[in-house]
């Protein structure tokens, strides 16, 4: 719900959580943590919104591998981190407590003070002439770990770049269209876990180049 409010602020998009791609971290297991450690990464729950080349917005809330060089890597416990990027201001990082008695009390006190002066909350992006819309036309680069390959729809992947097989648990890394995981349960059941890769949004133009590269590596 917090992410829905931020979408309204940043892009003027009105939506509900049931229309979004989201999941928590309860399915993350020991193998996933070991893979992250071997790559000098950590797994964080990250909400993202990015304007695509066609003007629509890709948005989701999922566990993600975060590189050690990324500022979000060091965000832990009750702290939150926000990264904002614009055409003129480049990247900006905000860091602070998102839970606890004092941060909550401070926010409530701020709202009470605002009411005294007749302040009304505004969503200025909702009044823009051409509101942004959520996109369903992009691919995601994901890591999937599982116990039984039969539960994974391999045919849905546009490409699979890594495959590791183990005695009890295996994983793969590949690129899959949003429609293959949005409102689908295969990646949430049968002890399956999904984690986004750091560079995870693949637009159609980039996907075409990815397929060309795959064919080239295959000698076709």
Which residue stretches match the model-derived regions?
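Substrate-binding/catalytic subdomain of NAD(P)-dependent oxidoreductase enzymes
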Residues: 1-74, 79-81
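Context-gated lysine
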Residues: 2, 34, 44, 50-51, ...
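Generic marker of "main functional regions" within proteins
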Residues: 13-17, 30, 46, 53, ...
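Short secondary-structure transition/capping segments
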Residues: 33-43, 91-99, 103, 161-168
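A short, terminal or domain-edge coil/loop segment
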Residues: 44-48, 99-112, 170-181
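A broadly conserved detector of short glycine/acidic/proline-rich loop/turn motifs that flank catalytic sites
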Residues: 47-49, 65, 88, 98, ...
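Catalytic, metal-anchored helix/loop core of enzyme active sites in primary metabolism
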Residues: 58-145
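A conserved regulatory-domain signal marking ACT and ACT-like small-molecule sensing domains
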Residues: 112-220
């Amino acid at each position: 719900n917090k992410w829905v409010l931020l979408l309204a602020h940043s892009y003027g998009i009105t939506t509900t959580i049931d229309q979004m791609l989201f999941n928590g971290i309860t399915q993350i297991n020991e193998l996933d943590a070991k893979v992250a450690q071997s790559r000098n990464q950590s797994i964080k729950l990250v909400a993202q919104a990015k304007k695509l080349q066609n003007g629509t917005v890709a948005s989701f809330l999922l566990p993600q591998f975060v590189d050690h060089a990324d500022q979000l890597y060091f965000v832990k416990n009750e702290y939150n981190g926000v990264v904002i990027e614009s055409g003129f201001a480049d990247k900006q990082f905000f860091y602070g407590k998102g839970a606890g008695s004092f941060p909550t009390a401070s926010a409530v006190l701020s709202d009470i003070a605002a009411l005294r002066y007749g302040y009304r909350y505004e969503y200025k992006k909702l009044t823009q002439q051409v509101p942004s819309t959520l996109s369903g036309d992009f691919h995601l680069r994901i890591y999937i770990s599982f116990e039984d390959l039969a539960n994974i729809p391999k045919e849905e992947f546009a490409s699979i770049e890594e495959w590791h097989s183990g005695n009890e648990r295996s994983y793969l890394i590949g690129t899959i269209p949003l429609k293959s995981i949005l409102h689908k349960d295969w990646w949430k059941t049968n002890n399956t876990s999904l984690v986004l890769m750091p560079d995870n949004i693949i637009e159609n133009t980039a996907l075409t180049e990815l397929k060309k590269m795959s064919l080239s590596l295959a000698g076709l």
